[in-house]
Amino acid sequence: MREYAKDYRSIAAEKQRQRQSKIPKDWLIDAQKYGEATNLLQVPVTCGILDGVEREITSNYDATALSEKIRQGVWSVEQVTVAFCKRAAIAHQLTNCLTEIFFDEAIERARQLDLEQREDPNCKALRPLYGLPISLKDSFQVVGQDTSTGLACFVKKPADQNSALAALLLDLGAILYCKTNLPQTIMTGDSDNNVFGRTLNPHNTALTAGGSTGGEGALIALRGSLLGVGTDIAGSIRIPSLCNGIYGVRGSVGVVPHSGVRDLAVPGTDGVRSAAGPMATSLRDCRLFMKAVMESETWRYDSAVVSVPWRNLQVKEKLRVGLVEDNGIHTPSPPIRRGLNKATQLLQRSNDIEIVPLKLPSIKEIYQDLFQYMAPLGTEHYSELFNRTGEPAIPSVDTIGLMSVEGTTLRGFFEMNARREEAAKKYLQLFCDNRIDAIMMPVAAHTAVPWDRWANATYTGLWNYLDYPAVVIPVDKVGETDLADDVVHAKYGPEDANLYRLYTGPELYRDAPIAVQVIGYRQMDEALINTAIFADSIINGKE
Amino acid sequence: MREYAKDYRSIAAEKQRQRQSKIPKDWLIDAQKYGEATNLLQVPVTCGILDGVEREITSNYDATALSEKIRQGVWSVEQVTVAFCKRAAIAHQLTNCLTEIFFDEAIERARQLDLEQREDPNCKALRPLYGLPISLKDSFQVVGQDTSTGLACFVKKPADQNSALAALLLDLGAILYCKTNLPQTIMTGDSDNNVFGRTLNPHNTALTAGGSTGGEGALIALRGSLLGVGTDIAGSIRIPSLCNGIYGVRGSVGVVPHSGVRDLAVPGTDGVRSAAGPMATSLRDCRLFMKAVMESETWRYDSAVVSVPWRNLQVKEKLRVGLVEDNGIHTPSPPIRRGLNKATQLLQRSNDIEIVPLKLPSIKEIYQDLFQYMAPLGTEHYSELFNRTGEPAIPSVDTIGLMSVEGTTLRGFFEMNARREEAAKKYLQLFCDNRIDAIMMPVAAHTAVPWDRWANATYTGLWNYLDYPAVVIPVDKVGETDLADDVVHAKYGPEDANLYRLYTGPELYRDAPIAVQVIGYRQMDEALINTAIFADSIINGKE
């Protein structure tokens, strides 16, 4: 047996001990008390750790409303920060959603902002995210913190530079206070790894919290954060947004700075690029984030941004929305069909929205190429990272078949690019010919599924392949009436049938969130967010 | 000896006859009369083909001023179109600058626009390029016209679709009337090919018209067009702009729609992408073009655009300009040094511009990689195209060594990408640390050189590699005082010395234009154009 400089188990044990030490004793909950519960959403307010003001701050506002309160001086930045640190600590103890905890640094910065504010009352006016605690997926670098991405070989190597976005968010006035869990390889639908373990879904702990930005999903669902940032190369913002019943925006590539995010791909891998975006409890918070970022000089922070500015576009008063009921390879499960129907019917009742049924072409071929784009040189680089500390692949890496992807050649790579250029033309034409403002469709063929069963990203990956922005809007939750139906309803062959069988009815899936995604034109993120806010206002009666 | 379906010579002969037939008899000049002259700039107004109004229309305005006259109804669109068709015909007979001639279609469209205008006087208000004749590099597809790019194998295959930009320009009100010459392979500094032959430089016919957009360069220098469109992957807009003493803008990749431009690269080749941009007799015409394009919905025309809108940015009143005197591998020739000094001194006299001397890092390594990016799979695809009709490579293809580029692997390609990402960070830092708005530097180490001697693009290619926008501003012309100096002044070794020796003094180089290029931040095309217009107003006393 090979000898490792250090075995992953001891690295993980030490890392977990250190992480635990970052939670003040007074904030510890009796986790055993909640061991039997599957739905943990109420625990933060019932566990007795938060005082009345902290419950108020963390429970009753979205980031937009909270920002207003901070500007009005209702609460100091320190009060707000402490409240969210506490609630994040509770969320973590319930779901294992955090990787790096730096509450002390955050509270110290909050105090400084409060001091500055006393000396110059105008200083906050200029900073659109002033005083707002923002959580980040572990892959973003924050000075002094590890960026292990759950790989043992990267533990205890604190960053000496911020990711471009972390630097920008600080300049915009935000408070960074924690980073969140993700899958080994950052490629699966289960936020599980050998260093930090698995993040649980607070709606139903028997189900996955989703991935790869699953830590954010669980943290935000429990309101341990109101605004977090994920990345999405095949669905990694949208899948956990669906699983955890929150809003999420996959921005177009480069619109939100992405440089300095740890990416496990071979350096220089191009083709389909990961994109960053916000996850939140309201869609207007996603807008707050996107507007703040797109109004700033992102190009000074990151040499790889796409400089699409926020334009304060007029909101359209009449919308045409393409409706895609299924993607032609994976049949949506009964709750997903019900959720999409519900959203469609609500939109149809509006005089301002016209629904246009659509079919998406070439999904199977596109998804095959997307999977190859994920690892054009094969997956040896992952094995090499695992082998440094002897860690095994997590189960969900096997579920998606990642380690069996073989590399292609330069010619094969360009052939994929050429096919993608053709697909891009076809899809633009589909949008233009139908004069649609957006497409509405499922985020996946199913809700959150039991652990380690999330097998593909055919509903989400298409939009990464084409680089169209996409927004997840929660619609409902699985309830008593969502019965399983017969597998004969699976229309697309044996693999589809296997996936379809996963849904066994409301007993196992109780409270699993149901969502839709809304997709807009490439780089038209602002227009899409406007459209999605309009749709959300009808579906969920918000803003 | 191999038998070809058809030999390139017969294809070229037939194509040239057809082209010649597109010029009305009344517009033919006695070309022999000008066989001895090297400077042809005055011939269009002295040859007797243009009447007084046509001379006025084509000689005394830039496109911006002419557009105003058209809107005022001083001249009909037909009058303007006929005048430019005539003058383009003259320019072509002098320099062989045109490939496809479609004057009839253009004049027919002009009549239609005039008719529409009579019926609805407001129709022109909405179209920013209303009634303006615009010429296109041959590689842009125009319905009904060949897109041979000077390759015999592509002759007699008329396009059934417009390039995205051609479609957009028509929708913006422009008149398309001709396409222009370029080098075989679209990769050299000499616009020469086996189908159409060589374009001459109207300033000095002993020198190259530059490439690859050399036909536009010659045509615009002779005012056979006021506004043309080129493409630039290593300098192909800027080199002919320098050689022909005109303005040219290499936009950032994707800002000006580029889809449907014939690209001889293997389909799907990515890495360094070609960018389109305007060439004109004034910089404000380049702005007119860029503003019109960037204000339109380019993303509806082209699935590959980068949606950076025109923002009507405030023009900065104080500028910091980085001055790069040479690029560290090729020593500028005496006229280039004089031109840059002249521009620098003029700018320094302004209270509003601060000059910051700069050195550019890593040019040699960057240029090596750029050259590999031009043909990552090697150059067999060119040979294959040549072989279809038995045509040989043109001399300038040998000069640049294109056919000896060997392919790389997918891993090698990603390694190049990774080096480029690092270079991009370094260069952004150079710009930001020095707080510069732009860099000013030579366009090449030399002016236009004798035929088939243009050997590299080390001054221009850098900005394609990094995707920074760049503007060419003419500064002066070679005159009596521009003596050659000793080769000891060549600082960078034998290859530099060979290049340096090319400049033999004002006898051979008489009237060769001298220019500078001004480079701005990636995708900040609008801000760069503002900066360049300001610099131009000081250097050339224009707007």
Regions found by a protein language model. Name each.
Chain A
Residues 74, 91-154:
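N-terminal, positively charged, Ser/Thr/Ala/Gly-biased leader segments
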Residues 1-115, 325, 345, 349-352, ...:
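An N-terminal boundary/leader segment
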Residues 126-276, 324-326, 376, 439-456, ...:
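Short glycine/serine-rich loop/turn segments
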Residues 77-81, 111, 332-359, 383-393, ...:
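Acyltransferase
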Residues 44-50, 54, 129-152, 312-324, ...:
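Short helix-loop capping/hinge segments that flank enzyme active sites or metal/cofactor-binding pockets
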Residues 90, 167, 171, 221-324, ...:
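Structural helix-boundary/capping segments
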